[in-house]
Amino acid sequence: MIRLHIIGLCASDVTKQTPRCGDAQIIDDGKNYEVIDGYCGKGANRLISALKKRKIYSPYLHITHAHYDHYYGIRAIIRDKTFSPKALYCYDPDSLRDVSKDVKDNKKALLNVINEAKARKIPVIYLKNGSIIEHGDINIVVYRNQPSKFSGNSDAYVNDGSLCYWFGNIGYLTTGDAGLDVAKRHKLFAKIIKIGHHGNNCVRVISRWLKDHGCKYCWDNDYSTSLTDFLMTGREDALAVGMTYFSVHGDINAIFRDGKAIIYKNGKAYSYLCDYVGKNTLNAATPYICRKVLRGSYGKADVRTTNLLNLGYSPTSIQNKINQIVEIATGIKDGKLDYGKNKARLQRIDAELGKGYGQLVQDYINVLFGVREKV
């Protein structure tokens, strides 16, 4: 099984002083852990916390491009002796050939991180267009189209040269801050995409091409605040052509197994078919875990989903188990219960989950993870 964990933020994480926070992703097959970019500011702290909570101490680190808001968390991992990274993947800073001050500063800052990694004897591997990374079930083809000329906008010059990672067996394309034209250029028929540069690097014509070729879902690191200086057009274009959009207000989680992907976001589940056939390694629901979920032990919505996946449980299995218990005990499916009128039947829920849970299920019925979309 492969899991994708996109670290989310909350509104308080983004301040007027630090509106640019980048993004961070953890993708793993249970043995190999890839950390792609690392936020800055509070986002970097959230990434470090997530890694330690999951006891991921030897990840592969990736920097998609030379903008600090995407790699300060990576630098923090390198500096933290708790971690022993297996390697650092990035591009050669010398591939940024422009001589403007901004680009020179970007190169110097990235080189400093690379030197810190080398000082800790972490292997540094430079990637280029066509590079391949294979770690267990994780297969990545790298695409890069660094502009040869400086257009007068240093951000655009560096963004457009981001490393784009194509996870073909799960249908996932993440682009750093590059434009999504990489998908059309290389015929990458993604099912879910990460829109680059806070949403403004995906033009309508590319969104339409992606949707026409099976792309159903997208996300970006637009925090939807008035504090950012960027025009958020990617989200609007993706929505306009019929994609489902996920924000990073809260975590985004996805699991891939048995030829199927399930994405968890905002208390709901979404799905699509994929080529990856790795077996499911999540635990099925038990009365014990159902009781704890109903009592709110793992939080709500995206927090709950992350916590359950961290513990190795399937959120969908838990939802289905609770729905099944309710339906068997009451004969009512997807409906509200009247505890007084259904007391005898609800006692059967108590017998399954423990005394007092009939009333709790009544109050909480069918609002845990939403209705799973059928493939």
Which sequence ranges carry the predicted segments?
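Core dinuclear metal-dependent hydrolase active-site scaffold
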Residues: 1-56, 126-189, 252-281
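Active-site environment of divalent metal-dependent phosphoester hydrolases
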Residues: 21, 42-43, 66-72, 95-98, ...
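Active-site metal-binding motif and surrounding structural segment of the metallo-beta-lactamase
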Residues: 30-34, 42-90, 185-200, 212-214
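Structural recognition of the beta-strand scaffold that forms the well-ordered cores
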Residues: 34-37, 59-63, 86-91, 126, ...
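Binuclear metal-ion centers of metallo-dependent hydrolases, dominated by the metallo-beta-lactamase
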Residues: 87, 95-141, 146-147, 155-159, ...
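Extracytoplasmic Gram-positive cell-surface binding/anchoring modules and repeats
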Residues: 283-285, 294-305, 314-315, 334-345, ...
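Repeat-associated, polar segments at repeat-unit boundaries in modular proteins
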Residues: 309-330, 352-375
